[in-house]
Amino acid sequence: MPVFQTKRFRPSTSAGSTLGDRIGQMYRAHLSKHPFLLFGLPFLSLMVAGSFVLTPATALRYERHDRKVQQVSQQEALALGIKGPDGDGENDIKMNPRRRVLGSEKEEYYRLMAKDLDNWEQKRVQRWKGEPDGRLS
């Protein structure tokens, strides 16, 4: 029986192999010898470059969002509590009874601190007929 050769078979570069094939073969051959240089370094540089490219894009996104959101002054906030026209003719603009008149933060703080939060009673909400009320007994 003949003995097999220990040399690897390397096909000759024929006219049929393209430049891309030859570059790919060389890349794969050198990849096992220098993995970080040929794979890791290009990957890391691509990530860093992508970060620098995408930074202005994200800044533009947030600037566009900030243009949409506008800060409302206290007078405008009070004006938002007014109801629109009802159509009755007399006073087309009526005050919303649920509108909360905003004062200073100190006034609100002292108003909340003055409430007696220790004396309270839990009351059940009245249910419609036929609606389960959640009681187990």
Curated annotation (Swiss-Prot):
GO terms for biological process: mitochondrial cytochrome c oxidase assembly. InterPro entries: Cyt_c_Oxase_assmbl_COX16 (IPR020164). Residues 1-11 form a transit peptide. The keyword Transmembrane helix applies. It is found in: Mitochondrion inner membrane. GO terms for cellular component: mitochondrial inner membrane. It is a single-pass membrane protein. The chain crosses the membrane at residues 35-55. Its main location: mitochondrion. Keywords: Membrane, Mitochondrion, Mitochondrion inner membrane, Transit peptide, Transmembrane, Transmembrane helix. Belongs to the COX16 family. Required for the assembly of the mitochondrial respiratory chain complex IV (CIV), also known as cytochrome c oxidase. May participate in merging the COX1 and COX2 assembly lines. This is Cytochrome c oxidase assembly protein COX16, mitochondrial. It comes from Coccidioides immitis (strain RS).
